[in-house]
Amino acid sequence: MMVDNQTPDSSTLSTASTPVYAEPQLTEELLERFDSFAQKVARHDGVSAFSEQTRIELSKALRESTLTPPRFFVAEDNGTLAAVFVALTPANDEDTGVIEAAVAPEYRGQGVGSAFFDHAVRQLGDDATRYRLWVHGSATDTGIESPAHAFATLHGFEPVRVLYKMVLPLDAQTREELVERSDARTLPENLRMRTFTGADEFPWLRVNAAAFAHHPEQGKLTLADLRERTGSPWFRPEGFFIASEVEDDSAIAAFTWTKIPTGQEQSELSPSGEIYVVGVNPQAQGGGLGRTLTLRALAYLACAEDENGEPLRAIDLYVDADNTAAYSLYTSLGFGVATVDRMYAPAQQDEPAA
């Protein structure tokens, strides 16, 4: 997220002139520069400013023509990306778009982000009110608000959604307990546990859409979105669990997908794995399938290694703050809130008095 009212590190303070704003045509070279920029911001902030879906949409726009391509704005200073603003365009008249943005660490505290953000929003025109702004790492588990939260409110946005990142550190005892809990769970006799295959693409998309019919992002996944993910270096089919009918593999009752990102830097809680998504067919809800599949995924991650053979040191996941059932489940399993992401919408303007 755009951060501008933060005191910059004097060791990296830029003395450059005012950056030039542009909405350049997306190219492979520009996408590589964006990736480097996003990685630099993430290393500095400890949290990514851009979601996986944003990166996927940019990649798709580069490869294929689309009716609603993302808007991509940059503030550039002599070949250096000082700030980036990405707006994922609404797919239809009822849809909302998503904004994610960031300022390079060395350009913060100089007014670069504020001026650039205002410029990019103006370029969206009358449609700007249809966009929602993501602030990743808006607050910590201690409740301390980030400069990005202050930035969002300063620019006329108010929180409309709260997403918790929850983390479970792994030690020998926790690993053993997760495996034991998973082994103690059984599926109904008409279901079997298996892992994802290519033949599951369309059945999975149908169940995912039904399970997340009211979810602003997950329920909209397309075949192209799915294939972007299953074609990613991090994808492991053995970590994508499906409960389907014994007599019909296409009848999916529930699923849990895990993710072990590649290229993780070593730290106290890294490498880590993620409970990527858990879904239950609405026709199969209420029978504890979500808990059973979640425990199976946790047991898998507890015993998994990264691409370098390093055991995972933590498991993380994301849950909406208003999903009290899921939050209670994860808390009971030992997860704690690490950071808070917030989605913001333009603040409602009061009608002028008659």
Curated annotation (Swiss-Prot):
Q: Does the keyword Nucleus apply?
A: no
Q: Which UniProt keywords apply?
A: Acyltransferase, Repeat, Transferase
Keyword flag Acyltransferase: yes
Report residues binding acetyl-CoA 1. Answer: 101-103
Q: What is its EC number?
A: 2.3.1.189
- What HAMAP family does the record point to? MshD
Functional summary from the UniProt entry: Catalyzes the transfer of acetyl from acetyl-CoA to desacetylmycothiol (Cys-GlcN-Ins) to form mycothiol.
This chain's protein is named Mycothiol acetyltransferase
According to its UniProt entry, this protein's organism is: Rothia mucilaginosa (strain DY-18)
